[in-house]
Amino acid sequence: MGQIKVEKNVGGIEGLCVIEPAVHGDARGYFMETYNEKDMKEAGIDIHFVQDNQSMSTKGVLRGLHFQKQYPQCKLVRAVCGTVFDVAVDLRSDSATYGKWYGVALSAENKKQFLIPEGFAHGFLVLSDEAEFCYKVNDFWHPNDEGGMAWNDPEIGIEWPELKGEYKGSASAEGYTLEDGTALNLSDKDQKWLGLKDTFKF
Protein backbone atom coordinates (compact mmCIF):
# COMPACT_ATOMS: atom_id res chain seq x y z
CA MET A 1 0.00 0.00 0.00
CA GLY A 2 3.09 2.18 0.20
CA GLN A 3 4.79 3.77 -2.81
CA ILE A 4 6.78 6.62 -1.35
CA LYS A 5 8.16 9.51 -3.37
CA VAL A 6 11.86 10.15 -2.73
CA GLU A 7 13.83 13.21 -3.83
CA LYS A 8 17.49 12.30 -3.46
CA ASN A 9 20.56 14.48 -2.94
CA VAL A 10 18.45 17.57 -2.29
CA GLY A 11 20.32 20.84 -2.46
CA GLY A 12 23.05 19.01 -4.35
CA ILE A 13 24.17 17.37 -1.09
CA GLU A 14 24.80 13.65 -1.39
CA GLY A 15 22.66 11.51 0.89
CA LEU A 16 20.05 14.07 1.91
CA CYS A 17 16.56 12.94 0.90
CA VAL A 18 13.07 14.40 1.15
CA ILE A 19 10.45 11.67 1.35
CA GLU A 20 6.72 11.99 0.74
CA PRO A 21 4.54 9.06 1.81
CA ALA A 22 1.50 7.96 -0.12
CA VAL A 23 -1.58 9.44 1.57
CA HIS A 24 -4.92 7.67 1.07
CA GLY A 25 -7.80 9.97 1.91
CA ASP A 26 -11.59 9.86 1.76
CA ALA A 27 -14.57 11.44 3.50
CA ARG A 28 -13.52 9.88 6.81
CA GLY A 29 -9.99 11.30 6.81
CA TYR A 30 -6.78 9.66 5.62
CA PHE A 31 -4.39 6.77 6.13
CA MET A 32 -0.67 6.61 5.40
CA GLU A 33 2.31 4.45 6.19
CA THR A 34 4.85 6.64 7.94
CA TYR A 35 7.61 4.07 7.49
CA ASN A 36 7.89 0.96 5.35
CA GLU A 37 11.26 -0.81 5.27
CA LYS A 38 10.49 -2.57 1.99
CA ASP A 39 9.61 0.67 0.21
CA MET A 40 12.73 2.34 1.57
CA LYS A 41 14.96 -0.48 0.35
CA GLU A 42 13.34 -0.36 -3.08
CA ALA A 43 14.21 3.36 -3.13
CA GLY A 44 17.84 2.49 -2.38
CA ILE A 45 17.70 3.41 1.32
CA ASP A 46 18.79 0.54 3.57
CA ILE A 47 19.05 1.74 7.17
CA HIS A 48 18.40 -0.17 10.37
CA PHE A 49 16.66 2.17 12.80
CA VAL A 50 16.87 1.30 16.51
CA GLN A 51 15.01 4.07 18.32
CA ASP A 52 12.07 6.46 17.83
CA ASN A 53 12.00 9.85 19.59
CA GLN A 54 9.36 12.56 19.92
CA SER A 55 9.56 16.12 21.21
CA MET A 56 7.12 18.99 21.69
CA SER A 57 8.29 22.58 21.32
CA THR A 58 6.61 25.97 21.28
CA LYS A 59 6.90 28.73 18.71
CA GLY A 60 10.34 30.28 18.46
CA VAL A 61 12.17 27.28 19.89
CA LEU A 62 15.32 26.37 17.97
CA ARG A 63 16.90 23.02 18.77
CA GLY A 64 20.36 22.49 17.33
CA LEU A 65 22.62 22.11 15.68
CA HIS A 66 23.37 18.64 17.06
CA PHE A 67 25.29 15.47 16.24
CA GLN A 68 27.09 12.57 17.92
CA LYS A 69 30.81 12.29 17.24
CA GLN A 70 31.87 8.68 17.78
CA TYR A 71 28.36 7.28 17.44
CA PRO A 72 26.92 9.31 14.54
CA GLN A 73 23.23 8.95 13.84
CA CYS A 74 21.25 8.80 10.64
CA LYS A 75 17.89 10.48 11.26
CA LEU A 76 14.50 10.26 9.56
CA VAL A 77 12.48 13.21 10.84
CA ARG A 78 8.97 14.61 10.45
CA ALA A 79 6.49 16.94 12.14
CA VAL A 80 3.26 15.31 13.33
CA CYS A 81 1.78 18.56 14.65
CA GLY A 82 2.57 22.11 13.56
CA THR A 83 5.40 23.33 11.33
CA VAL A 84 9.17 23.41 11.67
CA PHE A 85 12.01 24.49 9.42
CA ASP A 86 14.44 21.59 9.52
CA VAL A 87 18.12 21.97 8.64
CA ALA A 88 21.09 19.69 8.00
CA VAL A 89 24.71 20.86 7.66
CA ASP A 90 27.30 18.64 5.99
CA LEU A 91 30.24 18.02 8.35
CA ARG A 92 31.84 15.20 6.35
CA SER A 93 35.42 16.36 5.86
CA ASP A 94 35.83 14.43 2.61
CA SER A 95 32.58 15.73 1.12
CA ALA A 96 32.50 18.12 -1.82
CA THR A 97 29.70 19.94 0.01
CA TYR A 98 31.40 20.19 3.42
CA GLY A 99 29.94 23.15 5.29
CA LYS A 100 26.88 23.41 3.04
CA TRP A 101 23.35 23.36 4.44
CA TYR A 102 19.89 22.46 3.26
CA GLY A 103 16.57 23.27 4.89
CA VAL A 104 13.01 22.09 4.36
CA ALA A 105 9.65 22.95 5.92
CA LEU A 106 8.14 19.91 7.62
CA SER A 107 4.54 20.08 8.75
CA ALA A 108 1.55 18.00 9.74
CA GLU A 109 -0.05 19.27 6.53
CA ASN A 110 2.64 18.44 3.97
CA LYS A 111 3.65 15.19 5.75
CA LYS A 112 7.15 15.38 4.30
CA GLN A 113 10.01 13.51 5.93
CA PHE A 114 13.69 14.44 5.85
CA LEU A 115 16.40 11.77 5.79
CA ILE A 116 19.72 12.99 7.18
CA PRO A 117 22.70 10.61 6.92
CA GLU A 118 25.47 10.20 9.45
CA GLY A 119 28.02 13.01 9.35
CA PHE A 120 25.61 15.95 9.52
CA ALA A 121 24.64 18.50 12.15
CA HIS A 122 20.88 18.79 12.53
CA GLY A 123 18.45 21.30 13.98
CA PHE A 124 15.03 22.86 13.57
CA LEU A 125 13.09 26.06 14.26
CA VAL A 126 9.43 25.95 15.31
CA LEU A 127 7.25 28.27 13.21
CA SER A 128 3.79 27.29 14.53
CA ASP A 129 2.33 27.85 18.00
CA GLU A 130 3.44 24.33 18.89
CA ALA A 131 5.12 21.49 17.04
CA GLU A 132 5.46 17.82 17.79
CA PHE A 133 8.52 16.37 16.10
CA CYS A 134 9.33 12.69 15.55
CA TYR A 135 12.56 11.11 14.47
CA LYS A 136 13.92 7.67 13.89
CA VAL A 137 17.63 7.08 14.54
CA ASN A 138 20.02 4.24 13.71
CA ASP A 139 22.06 4.49 16.92
CA PHE A 140 21.18 5.12 20.53
CA TRP A 141 21.71 8.35 22.43
CA HIS A 142 25.17 8.61 23.97
CA PRO A 143 25.09 11.64 26.30
CA ASN A 144 28.88 11.82 26.62
CA ASP A 145 29.27 11.87 22.84
CA GLU A 146 27.13 14.91 22.06
CA GLY A 147 28.46 17.58 19.75
CA GLY A 148 27.06 20.74 18.25
CA MET A 149 27.70 23.88 16.28
CA ALA A 150 26.36 27.42 16.25
CA TRP A 151 22.98 27.73 14.58
CA ASN A 152 23.83 31.23 13.30
CA ASP A 153 27.44 30.82 12.16
CA PRO A 154 27.87 33.35 9.31
CA GLU A 155 30.30 30.99 7.58
CA ILE A 156 27.40 28.56 7.12
CA GLY A 157 24.77 31.24 6.55
CA ILE A 158 21.60 29.29 7.28
CA GLU A 159 18.57 31.31 6.16
CA TRP A 160 16.10 30.64 8.97
CA PRO A 161 12.64 31.76 7.79
CA GLU A 162 10.81 34.51 9.70
CA LEU A 163 13.84 35.11 11.92
CA LYS A 164 15.06 38.65 12.57
CA GLY A 165 18.18 39.70 14.42
CA GLU A 166 21.83 40.61 14.11
CA TYR A 167 24.77 38.26 14.59
CA LYS A 168 26.90 39.43 17.51
CA GLY A 169 29.72 36.91 17.44
CA SER A 170 28.14 34.01 19.31
CA ALA A 171 25.24 31.55 19.25
CA SER A 172 23.30 33.60 21.80
CA ALA A 173 19.57 34.01 21.14
CA GLU A 174 19.61 37.54 22.55
CA GLY A 175 18.05 40.08 20.19
CA TYR A 176 16.54 37.52 17.82
CA THR A 177 12.79 37.29 17.23
CA LEU A 178 10.37 35.88 14.71
CA GLU A 179 8.48 38.32 12.50
CA ASP A 180 5.54 38.40 14.93
CA GLY A 181 7.80 39.35 17.82
CA THR A 182 8.14 35.90 19.38
CA ALA A 183 11.54 35.69 21.06
CA LEU A 184 13.95 33.05 19.83
CA ASN A 185 14.30 30.33 22.46
CA LEU A 186 17.40 28.13 22.72
CA SER A 187 18.78 26.00 25.53
CA ASP A 188 21.80 27.33 27.39
CA LYS A 189 23.87 24.57 25.81
CA ASP A 190 22.81 25.45 22.27
CA GLN A 191 23.85 29.06 22.84
CA LYS A 192 27.43 27.99 23.60
CA TRP A 193 28.30 26.00 20.48
CA LEU A 194 31.04 27.37 18.22
CA GLY A 195 31.16 27.92 14.48
CA LEU A 196 32.21 25.62 11.64
CA LYS A 197 35.95 26.26 11.87
CA ASP A 198 35.94 25.11 15.51
CA THR A 199 33.47 22.25 15.07
CA PHE A 200 34.12 18.52 15.01
CA LYS A 201 34.60 17.08 11.52
CA PHE A 202 33.59 13.59 10.48
What do these predicted regions represent?
Residues 106-129, 135-138:
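Conserved metal-binding segment of the jelly-roll/cupin
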